[in-house]
Amino acid sequence: MTDTQNEAFKMPVNKIRLFEHGAPGSQNLKLTRKYYTEDMPDGRVKHIVQNITDPDIVPYIPDGIGNSTDRQRIPAVLIIPGGAFRRLVYNFEGEDVAKWLNSMGIAAFVLECRLPSDEHDNAEDVPLIDAMRAMRVIRGRAQEFGIDEAKIGVMGFSAGGFMAALLSTAYESDVYADYKYKDEYDKLSARPDFAVCSYPVISIDDCIEAGKRYMSEEQVLEIISDSETKILHKYNPDKLVRPDMPPVFICETDDDRTTLSENSVGFYMAARKAEVSAELHIFRTGGHGYGCGDDFAQTGEWKVLFTKWIKSIGII
C-alpha cells in the first residue's frame, strides 16, 4: 500500500488515520494519493483528492475548545465531500464547510475516504466502511476534542450526500465484520445523531428517469460511471430508510442536472413514510456543487435554514 502526500495545495497536518493496520479491503492495493487543483469557468479553483488507500479524518475544532471538564461540550459534524465517487472536492465541500461550522461553535471532521472507482476489495463497500469507522473514532475521542458524543452528525455533498444518507440508514452494517484489527472504537455506535444531505444522488433509477427529461437514456447511462452504477445498484438509501434513523435535512436546486432534485424528493418521501423527522428545501436556481452556497443568491440560504433546523432538533 502506498499513500503519499504530493500536495498541489496545502493540507492540514493534524490528520487522524482511521485504520492503524491498513484499511480493510485495501491492504494489497498500491496507489499514490494525489492532490491537485482544477480551474473552474467562474475563476474559482477546486482542490481535488484522489487515490486514497489509507483513509483519514481532518479535525477542525473551534478555538478555545478542547479536553476540559469545565467547558460545555459542543456538537460535531463528519463532513463527506462529493466528487462523483471518483475523487473528493476537498475545499468547497470539505474545508470551507468545516470553517463555517466552526464559526457556529460546531466541531467538524472532513473525511478523506476511499472511493469505489479504485480497485479495493469489495470496492462498493469501502466508503461506507470509512464513514462508519470515522463516526466511531469521533465518538471515541469526543472528550479529547470537547465534543458531546450524543450530538455527532454527518453532512455530505453530491456523492458525499449519498454517503450521508447511506450512513444514516445502514449504520449497523457488518461491512467490515471480518477485519482482524478491530479495537475499542468498533464497539461504539456508528449512527449519526442528525444528517444533512446536500444535492445528493440517492437512487440510480431516479437519476435515469429524471435525466431522460434532458437527454436519451443511452446518454444518461454514458454519463454514469461503472463505479457509480455498482455502488448505486448495491445500496439505495430510499429502500434502507428505517424508523430509528436520525433526523435528516435535505437541500437541492431545481435546475441541478447532475444529481436531479428527484433524488432529494424520493429520500424525503421515504423518510416521511417511515415517520422519520425530515426537512426538504429545493431552491429554484443554483445548479450543482454549490457547497456553502452564494450568500447573495438562493443557495446561500441553506446555511440559514440549516441553522434554524439544527436548533429546532436541540443540537445547538
Predicted regions and their residues:
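C-terminal catalytic histidine-bearing segment of alpha/beta-hydrolase fold enzymes
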Residues: C251, S261, V265-I316
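N-terminal cap/lid segment of alpha/beta-hydrolase-fold proteins
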Residues: D3-Q72
